[in-house]
Amino acid sequence: MNNNYPLGSIAQAVDVLKNEEVIAYPTEAVFGVGCDPDSETAVTRLLELKQRPVEKGLILIAANFEQLKPYIDDSMLTEQQRNTIFSAWPGPVTFVFPALPSTPSWLTGRFDSLAVRVTDHPLVVELCETFGKPLVSTSANLTGLPPCRTSQEVLAQFGDGFPVVVGETGGRLNPSEIRDALTGERFRQG
């Protein structure tokens, strides 16, 4: 890793991501851990860190809808469904879309769909724009522990050397709502 970047900076985080490592960063409600969705090595590291089975599938968080298009099939959406989704984005609502056949199973798990969100958190927008693609995003916590709400909590759970983007969460109390993009069914209340 290039040590010329300020610790906790976007530049340092992008360098870590490009090296197929996992980072932590603030989101709308809690800190998330994430990695390059196109790197099976990075996703495997994230799953091992979280002790999360690959079968559960993951969420991608992006700066804009264009970043998500290589992973999801939005061809079945009606105009009304599109309006519902885009009225919630950018923001703390995650939608489950049909996945493209080319989307790797390390992202979709046992499903033929993928959960995605366009964030309104300024640091995450900048992170995804600088990295040039979305990130895998899951809450920053070890199994059995509450999600981290500060960078200090991330370091306490994951270790002092863990790469974390310094910043504040968006102040929301609950994680993002999760809905089906086609049916509107709510899987998790936000």
Curated annotation (Swiss-Prot):
Catalytic activity: L-threonine + hydrogencarbonate + ATP = L-threonylcarbamoyladenylate + diphosphate + H2O
Transmembrane segments: none
Record InterPro entries: DHBP_synth_RibB-like_a/b_dom, Sua5-like_dom, TC-AMP_synthase, TC-AMP_synthase_SUA5
Protein name: Threonylcarbamoyl-AMP synthase
Record flagged with keyword ATP-binding: yes
Organism: Enterobacter sp. (strain 638)
Database matches in NCBIfam families: PRK10634.1
GO CC annotation terms, alphabetical: cytoplasm
Superkingdom to which the source organism belongs: Bacteria
Gene coding for it: tsaC
UniProt-listed PROSITE patterns: YRDC
Domain YrdC-like: 7-190
Gene3D superfamilies, per database record: DHBP synthase (3.90.870.10)
Keywords for the protein's UniProt record, in alphabetical order: ATP-binding, Cytoplasm, Nucleotide-binding, Nucleotidyltransferase, Transferase, tRNA processing
Any GO MF annotation of the entry: double-stranded RNA binding
Entry similarity comment: Belongs to the SUA5 family. TsaC subfamily.
Gene Ontology BP annotations: regulation of translational fidelity; tRNA threonylcarbamoyladenosine modification
Protein function: Required for the formation of a threonylcarbamoyl group on adenosine at position 37 (t(6)A37) in tRNAs that read codons beginning with adenine. Catalyzes the conversion of L-threonine, HCO(3)(-)/CO(2) and ATP to give threonylcarbamoyl-AMP (TC-AMP) as the acyladenylate intermediate, with the release of diphosphate.
EC number annotated for this UniProt entry: 2.7.7.87
Entry's localization field: Cytoplasm
